[in-house]
């Protein structure tokens, strides 16, 4: 089948989603609240979820492997999380606007699981966390360039929205490629692109820019599923420390998914700063930036540093403090849900990893039966399906995959009850039990017969 033929079946399969999309595009650009939620010819519209299942507006149900791009590691509506949230709601105040005990309670739990984090601040998303981590690096070092790994994503703001999906230049000396309109030209000069899993080339570039580089920010597992080598991680930690460059781990995707202690627990490496999000918020918007006390204390408020205190207007010391604020930072309902999620994961994490391994092995066998080159690439509870024989180590290796065939399979899978955005990574949850895996394998066999 051609992709166009598959799309015709898909349109007939989901007429209400199509209609809702046509209405949405009249008032929302592209019909979606975030660009990542769109796919051709239109995305499915959901109305509910329970456990491993998503329910769409046309009456179909799907095993959910998108997990909202990773946060839903317990699936939809996990009882212990719902119960904790309802108790918090019954307190009568959703939001205080003041400090509260849950802030320190969550911070202590995160410190326990992530020993590199001595202190932390809360944000409202992973994007906010990475943005604030870079401001911290600038404030601490007095330098304003950063190193960013090719193919790594750290949010939708200007300095890091370079070379995420695009590759240009020598493989050992990538060029910065803008991934959006509206990026200031100087961002290309201030963001140095580094080759992932190439320690020698990365070291050479860092040594060239050491006097002007504040930090290297990276996903220890590229796009959440392609792991760095231990050699690269050990070497990068050594060279950044030697050159006085801060090392920032963006663990928004890997936190609580590669291991309970994230990728840094898996690799046994302590970064200077860590960014968390996704799983930590249990499906609600939350982020964390944490790390060394001497760096975090740059954000501690001083008398006279409140930018909103008019009485300090003539003697403000705001410029002496790293400003950080947010109405919803440390939201009590979200911290409640996050603490409940961590409590479940401390009992269930090994099970989820085991189910992930079973799913990967079963899918590899199905593709082998069809004689289609395929490998699952991942670590912990996340992986992706790449249709290539090339060993996946670097960002540009991923581009050898047959994404055209993978996309056809994914659309056919939607019509067999398996939900993921076409070509996206798989995020496994605590509710993907053996029956769900068997359903998945059968759906794959049905879909691939139609190819």
PLM regions with names:
Residues 1-451:
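Conserved N-terminal phosphate-binding loop of PLP-dependent enzymes in the Aspartate aminotransferase
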């Amino acid at each position: 089948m051609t992709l166009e033929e598959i799309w015709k079946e898909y349109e007939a399969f989901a007429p209400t989603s199509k209609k809702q999309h046509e209405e949405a595009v009249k008032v929302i650009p592209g019909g979606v609240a975030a660009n990542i939620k769109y796919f051709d010819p239109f995305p499915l519209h959901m109305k509910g979820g329970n456990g491993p299942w998503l329910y769409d507006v046309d009456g179909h149900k799907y095993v959910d492997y998108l997990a909202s791009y990773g946060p839903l590691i317990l699936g939809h509506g996990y009882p212990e999380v719902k119960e904790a949230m309802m108790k918090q709601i019954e307190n009568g105040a959703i939001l205080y606007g003041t400090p509260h005990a849950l802030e320190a309670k969550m911070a202590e739990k995160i410190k326990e699981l992530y020993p590199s984090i001595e202190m932390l601040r809360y944000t409202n998303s992973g994007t906010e966390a990475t943005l604030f981590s870079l401001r911290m690096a600038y404030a601490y070092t007095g330098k304003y360039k950063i190193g960013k790994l090719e193919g790594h994503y750290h949010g939708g703001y200007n300095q890091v929205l370079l070379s995420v999906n695009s590759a240009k230049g020598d493989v050992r000396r990538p060029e910065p490629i803008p991934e959006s309109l509206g990026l200031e030209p100087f961002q290309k000069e201030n963001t140095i692109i580094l080759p992932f899993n190439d320690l020698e080339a990365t070291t050479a570039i860092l040594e060239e820019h050491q006097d002007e580089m504040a930090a290297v920010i990276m996903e220890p597992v590229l796009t959440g599923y392609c792991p760095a080598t231990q050699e690269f991680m050990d070497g990068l930690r050594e060279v950044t420390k030697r050159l006085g460059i801060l090392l920032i781990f963006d663990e928004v995707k890997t936190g609580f998914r590669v291991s309970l202690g994230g990728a840094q627990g898996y690799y046994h490496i302590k970064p200077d700063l860590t960014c968390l999000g996704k799983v930590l918020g249990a499906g609600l918007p939350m982020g964390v930036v944490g790390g060394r006390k001497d760096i975090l204390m740059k954000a501690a408020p001083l008398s006279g540093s409140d930018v909103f205190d008019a009485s300090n207007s003539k003697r403000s010391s705001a410029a002496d403090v790293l400003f950080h604020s947010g109405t919803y930072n440390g939201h009590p309902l979200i911290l409640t849900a996050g603490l409940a999620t961590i409590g479940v994961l401390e009992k269930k994490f090994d099970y989820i990893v085991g189910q992930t391994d079973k799913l990967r092995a079963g899918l590899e066998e199905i593709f082998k039966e069809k004689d289609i080159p395929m490998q699952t690439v991942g670590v912990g509870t996340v992986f992706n399906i790449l249709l290539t024989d090339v060993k996946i180590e670097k960002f540009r290796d991923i581009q050898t995959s047959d994404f055209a065939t993978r996309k056809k399979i994914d659309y056919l899978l939607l019509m067999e009850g398996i939900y993921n955005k076409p070509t996206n990574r798989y995020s496994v949850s605590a509710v993907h039990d053996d029956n769900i895996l068997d359903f998945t394998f059968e759906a794959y066999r049905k879909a691939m017969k139609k190819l």
